[in-house]
Curated annotation (Swiss-Prot):
PANTHER family (UniProt xref): MITOCHONDRIAL TRNA-SPECIFIC 2-THIOURIDYLASE 1, TRNA 5-METHYLAMINOMETHYL-2-THIOURIDYLATE -METHYLTRANSFERASE
Disulfide bonding pattern of the chain: 129-237
Reactions catalysed, as given in the entry: S-sulfanyl-L-cysteinyl-[protein] + uridine(34) in tRNA + AH2 + ATP = 2-thiouridine(34) in tRNA + L-cysteinyl-[protein] + A + AMP + diphosphate + H(+)
Residue(s) at site: Interaction with tRNA: 155, 385
Protein family per UniProt: Belongs to the MnmA/TRMU family.
Name of the protein described by the UniProt record: tRNA-specific 2-thiouridylase MnmA
Active site residues per record: 129 (nucleophile), 237 (cysteine persulfide intermediate)
GO CC annotations, alphabetized: cytoplasm
Sample GO molecular function, one term: tRNA-uridine 2-sulfurtransferase activity
Localization of this protein: Cytoplasm
A Pfam family it matches: tRNA_Me_trans_M
Enzyme class: transferase
Length: 406
């Protein structure tokens, strides 16, 4: 599919003396990767994916740009993003391909998100989009249509690829591709990537994993990339398109009034739909009370939101389903891990206890489930969000926090 693009400036010439030590290290690493140096770069039209493509070109790779068209409108993966991605490919003098994934995005992300909110949970659309819409379709399209066996994206994470010549080693770490946090702690996106399979990780490269966001901006400007100073989205793409998450949900779900109650059943307010609430939420409840109230639980069957003081929302454990084990195989025994239950939250110490999977886990081809026992009570644990397990910087695995009762 051909897209019209604005006239782009040619990429700036850079001598080796102008390169920073960090950039030289990244380029050197890319040059040393085994296999044919031909790759498709997932271009969203933002600065991160733009620099990813530029670094690969600098490292001497045969690069082709690949953009997924997910929806109409402004923003990355929308019509506006396609134009910027095409402009970057023009600057870098590389081919640009657009793949229409709007129907897949609608089914796997939009419908799943709306259904989740109806069920009183807070889904994590970014990880689902990565698993079902972005990585697998890009890998399959690049392999089938361009005979390219690798893809690269601008995610801030790292992959330590398996030592293919030691696949029979007793050392499990050498038998699996490992997913690691990005160097930039403020930008690390490994939390959203826990759901990627070993097969996918084997075909993926993350050139920005060793860089910081500020360095990326600086380098993009030095390259003269047209997206170097493009404003970064601060919200979910669907919320950005519609102006807010509430506006997005209002397009799909009509208002349905219900009660807001305390944990003892006392009615303290009214709401227009449980989909506008998430556990731990304090702002926007529309309730004047003698003390701050937080959402403690959501009961979809009763169309009811339960609120209370923050100390009533603490949990010592939670169940995690549809678990994907990334850097290790599924543990058969209890083990100590660090768990991150929200994107911007700090990892906390916990004990992971394997338990029997449900039929849903098995049907979703994720036959693993576990109970997480926190060292200290945790607040604002939201069903539908991901619980991702770490050991230091290594992503062990992760899954979906399951609904619970108070």
């Amino acid at each position: 599919m051909a897209m019209k693009s604005q006239k782009a400036k040619p990429i700036s010439n850079k001598s080796k003396l102008e390169r920073s030590p960090i950039e030289m290290e990244v380029v050197s690493h890319l040059k040393q990767l085994q296999g044919e140096h031909a790759i498709a770069v997932g271009l969203s039209g933002g600065v991160d994916s733009s620099l990813t493509a530029a670094l690969l070109v600098e490292a001497g790779w045969k690069v082709e740009g690949l953009t997924l068209w997910l929806m109409e409108g402004k923003g990355s993966c929308c019509t506006e993003g396609l134009v910027d991605a095409a402009g970057i490919c023009e600057q870098l003098k590389i081919p640009h391909h657009v793949v229409d994934e709007r129907s897949t995005f609608q089914k796997e992300v939009v419908e799943n998100l709306v259904n989740g909110y109806q069920e009183g949970i807070t889904p994590l659309p970014c990880s689902r989009c990565n698993r079902f819409v972005k990585f697998s379709p890009m890998i399959n399209w690049a392999r089938k249509n361009r005979n390219l066996k690798r893809i690269a994206t601008g995610h801030y994470a790292r992959i330590k690829h398996a030592e293919t010549n030691k696949l029979n080693s007793l050392d499990e770490r050498k038998n699996r591709h490992q997913l690691l946090r990005g160097i930039d702690q403020n930008k690390d996106q490994s939390y959203f990537l826990y759901d990627l399979s070993q097969e996918i990780l084997g075909h993926v490269v993350f050139p920005l994993g060793a860089l910081t966001k500020s360095f990326t901006r600086k380098e993009a400007n030095r390259y003269g990339l047209r997206t170097a100073n493009k404003k970064e989205s601060q919200d979910l793409c669907l919320a950005e398109k519609h102006g807010s998450m509430k506006a997005f949900l209002n397009n799909y779900l009509p208002p349905r009034k219900g009660e807001i109650v305390l944990t003892d059943g006392l009615v303290v307010g009214e709401h227009d739909g449980i989909e506008h609430f998430t556990i731990g939420q304090r702002k926007g409840l529309g309730i004047a009370w003698k003390e701050p109230l937080h959402v403690i639980n959501i009961q979809p069957s009763l169309n009811r939101v339960i609120v209370g003081p923050r100390d009533q929302s603490g949990r010592s454990n939670c169940t995690v389903g549809e678990v994907n084990w990334v850097s290790i195989s599924a543990p058969m025994q209890e083990r100590l891990v660090e768990v991150q239950v929200r994107y911007r939250s700090d990892p906390v110490k916990a004990k992971l206890v394997p338990i029997e999977p449900t039929i849903k886990d098995i049907k979703n081809n994720r036959p693993h489930r576990c109970r997480i026992e926190f060292e200290n009570p945790q607040f604002s644990i939201s069903p539908g969000q991901a619980a991702v397990f770490y050991k230091g910087e290594v992503v062990l695995g992760g899954g979906i926090i399951q609904p619970f009762e108070y």
